[in-house]
Amino acid sequence: MLNRTIAKRTLATAAQAERTLPKKYGGRFTVTLIPGDGVGKEITDSVRTIFEAENIPIDWETINIKQTDHKEGVYEAVESLKRNKIGLKGLWHTPADQTGHGSLNVALRKQLDIYANVALFKSLKGVKTRIPDIDLIVIRENTEGEFSGLEHESVPGVVESLKVMTRPKTERIARFAFDFAKKYNRKSVTAVHKANIMKLGDGLFRNIITEIGQKEYPDIDVSSIIVDNASMQAVAKPHQFDVLVTPSMYGTILGNIGAALIGGPGLVAGANFGRDYAVFEPGSRHVGLDIKGQNVANPTAMILSSTLMLNHLGLNEYATRISKAVHETIAEGKHTTRDIGGSSSTTDFTNEIINKLSTM
């Protein structure tokens, strides 16, 4: 009975993945491109330049929306993604002041039900870090938890914020995490929670991850850890973790720790998946407002995210070539950006990648 259940679920997952893939028109894919705020245009321009040099069969539908456009501005991006099914995206800045609007990033994910965020934290040769050989994946639920956006001021000076956790969405992210681990030969999945305090909400999350792991994925080790301890352990002994699956807020916290471990936010590739749509973006949430327009941003995270997109589209050879060129450029160390110890501009780094591609 269990094997039959797993088979049915696997077939359903495969069918969903098939629906996610966009269609080719004239042998080419159309991809929604959302540069976003901060250094978004500079790092997406880097990707466009590399793709053009490689003659990759992709056309861009560019949606220029800024954080100042408020949630109404997300409509254009949503409609474009509904047409194209796939996107490459920078980050929108979310103001922290009380008068600011809600997150456009969250609004986009919720409207399209892009429920799974994947961030890849892997050490790169040539980048000096405190701890070598990091290889960690953080998968977080994108559409509920603390990021449900449900809060109000009941009376002046008293604010209530609601954290929503549901069984269906937790089961969905659990199976996504275990399927991902299985596909990429990962040995363990760890649920991150705060069930010692939020016994119902985080208790539900922890229990469902554990239950599904034990019943449906016996070949993958499943465990759980309180988020405070997870943060400490990630800094002290990161190699003990393989795949971490988290509610929304904990994933952003651990993601920043992961970025610090491998050398900074400019190195973290990421992606977001839903039933019908996939959006690829840097895995660490840093907009770079302070260096906007200076041509010093590290485009590695965006470039590597674009290679994940190419693999998703079945353009694996292009993805492999570009990824190899990026890794060789960083390992060589002669044309790297200042965040990882170099002095090259975004443009110089991009051009060196293209030079390496031309000799492959």
Swiss-Prot record:
Q: Which GO terms describe its cellular component?
A: cytosol; isocitrate dehydrogenase complex (NAD+); mitochondrial intermembrane space; mitochondrial matrix; mitochondrial nucleoid; mitochondrion
Cofactor dependence: Mg(2+); Mn(2+)
Quote the SMART domains the UniProt record gives. Iso_dh
The UniProt catalytic activity note for this protein reads:
D-threo-isocitrate + NAD(+) = 2-oxoglutarate + CO2 + NADH
Amino acids binding Mg(2+): D228
E.C. numbers: 1.1.1.41
Question: Which GO molecular function terms does the record list?
Answer: isocitrate dehydrogenase (NAD+) activity; magnesium ion binding; NAD binding; RNA binding
Subcellular location(s) of the protein: Mitochondrion
Its job: Performs an essential role in the oxidative function of the citric acid cycle. Also binds RNA; specifically to the 5'-untranslated leaders of mitochondrial mRNAs.
In the record, the note on similarity to other proteins reads: Belongs to the isocitrate and isopropylmalate dehydrogenases family.
What other facts are recorded? Present with 10500 molecules/cell in log phase SD medium.
Protein name (database record): Isocitrate dehydrogenase [NAD] subunit 1, mitochondrial
Organism this protein belongs to? Saccharomyces cerevisiae (strain ATCC 204508 / S288c) (Baker's yeast)
